[in-house]
Each structure stands twice: as structure tokens, then as C-alpha cells.
Design a protein with these regions (language model features):
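Residue-level recognition of secondary-structure-to-loop junctions
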Residues: 353, 390, 396-402
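Substrate-binding clefts and catalytic carboxylate motifs of secreted carbohydrate-active enzymes
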Residues: 32-33, 40-49, 209-378, 391, ...
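Active-site mouth of glycoside hydrolases
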Residues: 26, 30-33, 37-190, 196-203, ...
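C-terminal motif of bacterial Sec signal peptides marking the signal peptidase cleavage site
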Residues: 17-18
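Positively charged n-region of N-terminal signal peptides that target proteins for export
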Residues: 1-5
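C-terminal edge beta-strand
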Residues: 422-429
């Protein structure tokens, strides 16, 4: 009797564990009608992924089953796969590659990469939480959209496959039809292509239909409209969407262009965490934590709400506050707001709260970012101007005494664990 009980417990453990074997072992992509399906150990699996390793407990509670990384040593990958096992998730493990085309003619660099890839493949070839290897991320963004680079990606793909027969092999490109055609020409050994796309998400189906590449793909980064794609002020400050506008876009892009595409095996939403890129909030699905004076503790944004809704197909019992707009002196960001040095101004945030909770408003002014990264590389947090203000009022009055380009940030908190965000760029000019 005890043996029978233990047997059924084992079966249940296998059923509910993401990283487990079944009678059919391995990861495969199979043709299905006019698209493709992914099978992990015999189970059809659609990838509901996040970019990054932050708060994976929230990711799984929200319906995610995978996460993506951008690189790592053997020891770092071991830690990553331990995280995956603890959270019952799969990993698309990145392998960092240079964007400098010259290096693809450098034997020393290529030998180094061959050894790194060989060691990774040999070490993790049997790991059941590993989904796929991602060779490089947007290498074509520099000047490496060349045959030599893609031929080396093909060489590394073949090297991995000669060692690791369980896991898939991919590479990741930006939204670049030319790079997609290069992959079709030079890299036939890939199991699927990863593509990072933001604003042109609606063009994805047509792009793949018109491309020479005819295989499966995943959307390996996606999210709000990028700062390079949006409207800017007359002084070139990009205008960021409110968190409510982002929430709507996340849901629309997922349902209309990701899950509805039969060639798409799933996606990794970006960024499941927080980063500085033009602003502290542009791609961040969680807000900052432990910043001096700022009473934020890594709360969830409405984009987390959006993903839970589309992943689970269920409505949430608690939702984020809806920020309708922020104005400065009754003007919107699109109005190219210019203020005078030393003259007080008033900002206002208009909010809808379905649950009628008491709200806390946090106001912060930062200088407009001037130290800018490339391709998502590190950017420092811009300098703060004045003090952070926290109140229960949806209006804020202050004065700037030095000319320059600035951005006013508004955060709306309640007791649900969500925070809604908005910011408006403005310029302060000297009095005539």
C-alpha cells in the first residue's frame, strides 16, 4: 500500500514540476499546420516568459513558466538553474557575443568563445530546467551583421548540438529584416530565432512571411513602445507612456501579435525588474527600491497586472490605479512645456481607482538623462533636483531656479502592492 501511495505521489510531483522528465525525453519543435509547436519531454508547452531573474515568485504566481538571461559563466549559470528549479521554470540561457565585426576575424576571440561554449554545453547538457541556448543578443546592432559573424554563430550552434542533444539552440536579433534573412542564409542549424521587438510588433507576421527564414521564432524581448520609436519634445526628450497606456499595449500586443501567431512558440516580456534606460521607469515592470528619499520598495506596475491577465486568462481581484494623465500648468508633454526660471508651477495627476483605496502621491524631479547607453547598456540615474515630496494630494507645486531640461515623475501608491507611474519632460528657460 505504501509503495502504491509513493508511486502516485511521484507521478503528481512530475506532473506539477516544470523541470521534469516524462517517458519521452528531450525538447523538440514540430510542424503543426501553418505553424509550430514546442514539446518538452513530450508535453506541448507554450513559453510564457520574463526577461530577468527578479521576483520569480511573482512571475510564477502570475502564470509565467520561463525566464531569459543574457549570459553567464558556468558558476553563474548553475545559480540561474537553481533559481529555475526552485521556481519550477525553464531558462533560455544567453551566451554573450560581441557586436564588433572586427572580432569575428580574430582567432583569439573565436577560440575563447569556442572554449566557453564547449564548457557550458558539456556542463549543462542534461539539465531539465534548461530550455535553450541563445547565442548572442542583437549582435547586428553594432556592425556585425556580416557573413563572418553569422557563420561563427552557425559554428557555435553546431558545436553545441554535437555535445548537447537535449536543448534547443537559438540566436537573438533586434527587429531587423536584413538580419533575419542573414540567419536564413548563414545559420541553418538554429532551432528557432529570437527577435526583440517593441513598437513594430504589428509588423511581425508580415516580416516573417516575407523573410527567407521559414522556421519557428520567439519574441525574446517586447514591451512598451521604445524611446527611439516614440514622439519627442522639441528638445529631443522622448515622451514616455503612462503605466496605464503601457498596460493596454502589453495586453494588446500579446493577444493580437504573439499568442495569435502560429509560428511563435512564446515570448519573454521585458523587463521583469527595474533598470535605468532614459528614465527609471521606461522598461521597468517593477519600480526602484531603496533609493534615498524615495518611498518605493520595488512595487509591481500595471504591466505585471497585464501579464497575469493574459497568461492566466483570468481577471485580477486587485488592480493598479489608472493614471489618466499628468499635466504641468494644464499642459501635456506633447505641448512642449517650457517654464521660466524662478516662477512657480503646478503639476496634477488624474487618477481612477476602481477599489476606492486611499492613495499616496510621490513626486520627484530629475534632470533629463544625458549619459546614455547603447543597445540597453548601463546608464546612471540622472541627478535629482530638490526633494522628493510625498502627500495625499494629486497636485504638486514647486519652482526651478536653474535653466535646463528636466522630467517630473509621479508615482501613485495604495495598499495593493501596485504602483502606477507617469512622467513629463519639461524645459526651464531664463526670463527674457
Amino acid at each position: 500500500m505504501n509503495r502504491i501511495l509513493l508511486f502516485y505521489i511521484f507521478l503528481l510531483a512530475c506532473l506539477f514540476s516544470a523541470c521534469s522528465f516524462s517517458s519521452k525525453s528531450g525538447i523538440e519543435i514540430e510542424r503543426a499546420g501553418n505553424g509550430y509547436k514546442l514539446y518538452i519531454d513530450g508535453r506541448e508547452t507554450y513559453i510564457k516568459g520574463v526577461g530577468g531573474t527578479y521576483r520569480l515568485d511573482v512571475a510564477t504566481q502570475s502564470g509565467a513558466n520561463a525566464f531569459r538571461t543574457w549570459g553567464g559563466t558556468v558558476e553563474e549559470v548553475k545559480k540561474t538553474l537553481t533559481l529555475a528549479s526552485e521556481n519550477k521554470m525553464y531558462v533560455m540561457q544567453g551566451i554573450g557575443m560581441t557586436k564588433d565585426s572586427i572580432r569575428y576575424y580574430d582567432d583569439a576571440y573565436k577560440d575563447k568563445m569556442r572554449e566557453e561554449v564547449r564548457l557550458l554545453a558539456e556542463t549543462f547538457k542534461n539539465d531539465t530546467c534548461l530550455l535553450a541556448w541563445g547565442i548572442g543578443n542583437e549582435i547586428e546592432l553594432g556592425n556585425a551583421n556580416i557573413g563572418a559573424a553569422w557563420r561563427f554563430v552557425e559554428e557555435l550552434a553546431q558545436l553545441i548540438k554535437s555535445i548537447d542533444q537535449r536543448h534547443l539552440v537559438s540566436t537573438v536579433i533586434s527587429y531587423n529584416p536584413s538580419a533575419l534573412d542573414s540567419i536564413a542564409k548563414y545559420v541553418p542549424s538554429l532551432d528557432y530565432v529570437g527577435i526583440n521587438v517593441y513598437g513594430p510588433m504589428g509588423e511581425i507576421r508580415q516580416t516573417f512571411e516575407q523573410s527567407d527564414y521559414k522556421g519557428a521564432f520567439m519574441i525574446t524581448e517586447w514591451g512598451p513602445t521604445g524611446w527611439w520609436e516614440t514622439t519627442s519634445t522639441e528638445w529631443k526628450a522622448p515622451i514616455e507612456q503612462t503605466s496605464e497606456e503601457k498596460r493596454q499595449i502589453y495586453e494588446e500586443r500579446y493577444t493580437q501579435h504573439i499568442s495569435a501567431n502560429p509560428r511563435c512558440l512564446g515570448s519573454f516580456v521585458f523587463l521583469w525588474g527595474q533598470k535605468e534606460e532614459r528614465t527609471p521607469t521606461w522598461f521597468s515592470m517593477f519600480v526602484e527600491d531603496n533609493v534615498d528619499q524615495l518611498p518605493l520598495r520595488g512595487e509591481k506596475t500595471p504591466m505585471v497586472e497585464a501579464m497575469q491577465r493574459v497568461w492566466t486568462n483570468k481577471e485580477l481581484t486587485e488592480t493598479a490605479r489608472i493614471i489618466e494623465a499628468m499635466t504641468i500648468n494644464h499642459k501635456h508633454a506633447i505641448d512642449n512645456i517650457r517654464l521660466k526660471v524662478g516662477v512657480p508651477f503646478t503639476a496634477q495627476v488624474d487618477v481612477t481607482d476602481k477599489e476606492n483605496n486611499s492613495l499616496i502621491y510621490v513626486w520627484e524631479i530629475l534632470k533629463e538623462a544625458t549619459v546614455l547607453g547603447f543597445g540597453g547598456s548601463y546608464e546612471p540615474r540622472p541627478e535629482r533636483v530638490g526633494e522628493v515630496t510625498t502627500s495625499d494630494a494629486n497636485t504638486y507645486e514647486t519652482t526651478i531656479h536653474t535653466s535646463g531640461n528636466y522630467r517630473l515623475y509621479g508615482y501613485v501608491l495604495d495598499n495593493t502592492g501596485f504602483v502606477s507611474t507617469v512622467n513629463v519632460p519639461f524645459q526651464v528657460i531664463n526670463k527674457e
